[in-house]
């Protein structure tokens, strides 16, 4: 089958926002207008098409990023709906990794909110062009120009309106197009009947002022337009649109649109803007990767003629077809039934069926082309972030960074029958979600799960119950502490045992130094002259890695330490891998005496919004929880406080805030960094852990 839409006519976009900005409703409307749905599902009725997991429909939030294909103005638009809740950051990250452009949805009453900042920062890291849709213009307190100002103040974004609203709240009835300088008036509830009229007289001055600002802002990004603008020449609508497109694709400019997805206003114009201003796969730089055979950097331009290269960005378990692997094709063509090489794992995989997804229904296709997003059935070894390529043209594409989990829970099956099922369920859930870890405590035999937040683990335990029919008891959430060294030291590990026959002998000198935050453990072999034979070096590293899994102070994993093996000795007969492993772990214990070991705790960036009169309470809450205030701003009658607070102090805070503010306060928190715990707290943690043992 030939290609249905050319690469120029393909758009891969994500819809990203703060929780509750109306993102899923916006996606619903896109699917409605592009002819994919016959009846609109409302999120607050629990009937949304994209939110297809049972829990999402109950909670009214989007958890998994379903990928959907739609058509608009003879273009194919692949849409990835991303969650707005901070506990699901990895979902946002992995969808950003495979997108070409994004629509950032704002709530017009609140403007830029905490999670908007997080996803905006991630999109900037990945260099994703964006347009902004100020949604909920029908809501009480909606303020379009305030929303635009928050883009400047909180994100330092070069964002400018290309539309203005006509009316707001209940009176929101149309949109002014600042490029055509026309008004689009809505005459029915479904938003399908639109009258294009001249701009109403009372809005004309404002429209001319913002048109002028728009032209100037776009001209600043383009030398030719700047010359025309300065010489007072007329810039045509076509030139203005071309200038906006170029600057948006170069991530120098962000067009801002307005509307109300719930009231069916502004969504079609936003779809037009997706086509007009967001890039096709041809507009973005060719993807780079490493050839695993030569270690040389290679590129794969978006073209069907190039060898096949794709990135797996999501694994899902589907009740009907089993394991689904969502992937983005960067170059080449793939037929169902063919073989590909997973270059990340060095494994050959057979592509069973290829499906194009529409929320939770699917269409089987024979061929997938460059620039497309699809799901494959039948891949056994592929996980999130793996590269799939032509067997004759290997390349490893840049993977997806996975943040470390910050919270853990103990889970135990309720019955023997649940025990076996729980193992399988947890393994499948961990395959789908790289930020979800499952470990067994060797000493107690307990299963410990860890993730990005309480909601994250709640949802996973819930899925275990619903999808895998496993009943489990869940312990109270615990903080994932880490340990590290704060000073450099040298230490000897010496192990010798003689018990008749062959003995054991291992002797090492290791220099330990603190490593940069986030660098993890690094091992360096600096042995000269074979004082420790080469075959025992891996055993020394392994001994350190295994010992560091249970740190020296309270048994938490050790991070950010460099170890340099620089001296030692061996015995011709008695030395063995085991002896050197034990010697390395003894060196680590010895180093702990002088390397200033410290316990680290996750610090959360907490954003608390409260009525003015509760500001004093909130400041007290932050101080009492060992937090430090980072900034404050007023918004209407509310105060927004940003603070860094240890996760350990935030359990149960929702209840405290609710009673202090009579239910009017809200807060969001997102993991920010690890930090040393104060000495007094460290002693408590050590005492508690020793007591438990």
UniProtKB/Swiss-Prot annotation:
Protein name: Elongation factor G
Keywords, comma-separated and alphabetical: Cytoplasm, Elongation factor, GTP-binding, Nucleotide-binding, Protein biosynthesis
Positions of GTP binding: 17-24, 81-85, 135-138
CDD domains: EF-G, EFG_III, EFG_mtEFG1_IV, EFG_mtEFG_C, EFG_mtEFG_II
Gene Ontology molecular-function annotations: GTP binding; GTPase activity; translation elongation factor activity
Family, per entry: Belongs to the TRAFAC class translation factor GTPase superfamily. Classic translation factor GTPase family. EF-G/EF-2 subfamily.
GO biological process: ribosome disassembly
């Amino acid at each position: 089958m030939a290609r249905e839409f050319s690469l120029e006519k393909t758009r891969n976009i994500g819809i990203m926002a703060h929780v509750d900005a109306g993102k899923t409703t916006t996606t619903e409307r896109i699917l409605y207008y592009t002819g994919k749905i016959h009846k609109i599902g409302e999120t607050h009725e629990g009937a949304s098409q994209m939110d297809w997991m049972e829990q999402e429909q109950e909670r009214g939030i989007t958890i998994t990023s379903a990928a959907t294909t739609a058509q608009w103005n003879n273009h194919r638009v692949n849409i990835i709906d991303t969650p707005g809740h901070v506990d699901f950051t990895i979902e946002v990250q992995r969808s950003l990794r495979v997108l070409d452009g994004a629509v950032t949805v704002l709530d017009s009453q609140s403007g830029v909110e905490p999670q908007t900042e997080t996803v905006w920062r991630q999109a900037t890291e990945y260099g994703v062009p964006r347009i902004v849709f100020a949604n909920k213009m029908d809501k009480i307190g909606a303020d379009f120009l305030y929303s635009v100002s928050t883009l400047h103040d909180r994100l330092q974004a070069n964002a400018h309106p290309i539309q203005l609203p006509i009316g707001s709240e209940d009176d929101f009835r149309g949109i002014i197009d600042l490029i055509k300088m026309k008004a689009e008036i809505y005459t029915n509830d479904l938003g399908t009947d639109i009258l294009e009229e001249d701009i109403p007289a009372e809005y004309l001055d404002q429209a001319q002022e913002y048109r002028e600002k728009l032209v100037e802002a776009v001209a600043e990004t383009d030398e030719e337009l700047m010359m025309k603008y300065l010489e007072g020449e007329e810039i045509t609508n076509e030139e203005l649109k071309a200038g906006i497109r170029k600057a948006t694709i170069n991530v120098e400019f962000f067009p801002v649109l307005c509307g109300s997805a719930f009231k069916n206003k502004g969504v079609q114009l936003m779809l037009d803007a997706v086509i007009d201003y967001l890039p096709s796969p041809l507009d973005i730089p060719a993807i780079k990767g490493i050839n695993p055979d030569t270690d040389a950097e290679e590129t794969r331009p978006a073209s069907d003629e190039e060898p096949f290269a794709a990135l797996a960005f999501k694994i899902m378990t589907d009740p009907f077809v089993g394991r689904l692997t969502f992937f983005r094709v960067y170059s080449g063509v793939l037929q169902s039934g063919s073989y590909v090489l997973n270059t990340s794992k060095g494994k050959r995989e057979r592509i069973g069926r290829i499906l194009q997804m529409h929320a939770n229904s699917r269409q089987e296709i024979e061929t997938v082309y460059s620039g497309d997003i699809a799901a494959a059935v039948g891949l056994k070894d592929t996980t999130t972030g793996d590269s799939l390529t032509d067997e004759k043209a290997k390349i490893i594409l840049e993977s997806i960074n996975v943040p470390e989990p910050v919270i853990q829970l103990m889970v135990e099956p309720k019955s023997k029958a649940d025990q076996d099922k729980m193992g399988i369920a947890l393994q499948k859930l961990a395959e789908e979600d790289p930020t979800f870890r499952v470990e067994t405590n060797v000493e107690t035999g307990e299963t410990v799960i860890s993730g990005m937040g309480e909601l994250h683990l709640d949802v996973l335990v819930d899925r275990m119950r619903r999808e895998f029919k496993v009943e489990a008891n869940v312990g109270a959430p615990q903080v994932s502490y880490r340990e590290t060294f704060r000073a450099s030291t040298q230490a000897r590990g010496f192990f010798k045992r003689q018990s008749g026959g062959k003995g054991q002998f291992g002797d090492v000198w290791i220099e330990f130094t603190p490593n940069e935050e986030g660098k993890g453990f690094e091992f360096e072999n600096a042995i000269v002259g074979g004082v420790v034979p080469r075959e025992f070096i891996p055993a020394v590293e392994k001994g350190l890695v295994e010992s560091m899994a249970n740190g020296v102070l309270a048994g938490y994993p050790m991070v950010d330490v460099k170890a340099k093996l620089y001296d030692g000795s061996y015995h011709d007969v008695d030395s063995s891998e085991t002896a050197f492993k034990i010697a390395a772990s003894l060196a680590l214990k010895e180093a702990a005496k002088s390397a200033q070991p410290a316990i680290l705790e996750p610090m959360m960036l907490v954003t608390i919004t409260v009525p003015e009169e509760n500001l004093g309470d909130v400041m007290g809450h932050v101080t009492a929880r060992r937090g430090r205030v980072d900034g404050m701003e007023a918004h209407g009658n509310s105060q927004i406080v940003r603070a860094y607070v240890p996760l350990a102090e935030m359990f149960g805070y929702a209840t405290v805030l609710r009673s202090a503010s009579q239910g009017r306060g809200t807060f969001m928190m997102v993991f920010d960094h690890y930090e040393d715990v104060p000495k007094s707290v460290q002693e408590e943690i050590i005492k508690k852990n020793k007591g438990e043992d």
